[in-house]
Amino acid sequence: ENKTRIFLKKIEKFFPFIINHDIEIKSNNTFPHSSGIASSASSMAALSSCLVDFEKMGNTTMSDEYFYKKASFIARIGSGSASRSLYGPIVIWGESKAYKTSNDLFGTDISNQTHDIFKEFNDTILIIDPGQKKISSSQGHELMNKNPFSSQRYEIAKKNVLDLKEILKSGDLDHFISITESEALMIHSLMLTSNPSYILM
């Protein structure tokens, strides 16, 4: 697939051995492709893990910590959400004042700073339409960058992460639900006010 070829080209400098090998990729995913529920995150996380595993064959001293950090770093290049898909159960991606070890390069596991109630959460996804979404993630991100309200959105998101740190520690479900619902509605509001505008729900 074209997206995979572009991804492999981007990461050549981190895996020089790719240039000298033919890579055959066989994958299967229970999520519908490009429907807006992060199928690319799981696929890029899996592919990145395989590549670092391949690298580890020539470096038997590679630590588990380094393995997962590099896999997360590489996965992020293919899909931002993929950086959070390699360990956990609760991972933050992106630098935030709330978490000292957080950064923009790879996901940071915050499970040990999180109340047990959140570790019992599961997703249930009802697929109504398995078709592909009309606006790709990359197109959506581009529209967000040009949105006149994006700067306010970023500031609110930063504040929400700070608030969520205490909420995740305490297990305060009411405030957790309030923030997550507000986040979802705000994202959809930005979509409606982008140019061109679109509806994802």
Describe every region a protein language model picked out:
Residues 1-35, 49-65, 112:
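ATP-binding N-lobe of GHMP and related small-molecule kinases
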Residues 3, 39, 43-47, 156, ...:
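Catalytic-loop motifs flanking and including active-site residues across diverse enzymes
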Residues 16, 46, 56, 64-75, ...:
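Domain-wide signal for the mature, well-folded portions of proteins, strongly enriched
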Residues 26-28, 94, 127:
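Residues in well-ordered beta-strands of folded domains
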Residues 33-85, 92:
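Long, hydrophobic, well-ordered secondary-structure blocks that form the structural core
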Residues 36-39, 87-88, 96-97, 136-140:
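Short acidic, glycine/serine/threonine-rich loops at helix termini
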Residues 66-118, 190, 198:
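Alpha/beta catalytic cores of group-transfer enzymes, especially the acyltransferase/condensing modules
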Residues 112-201:
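C-terminal nucleotide
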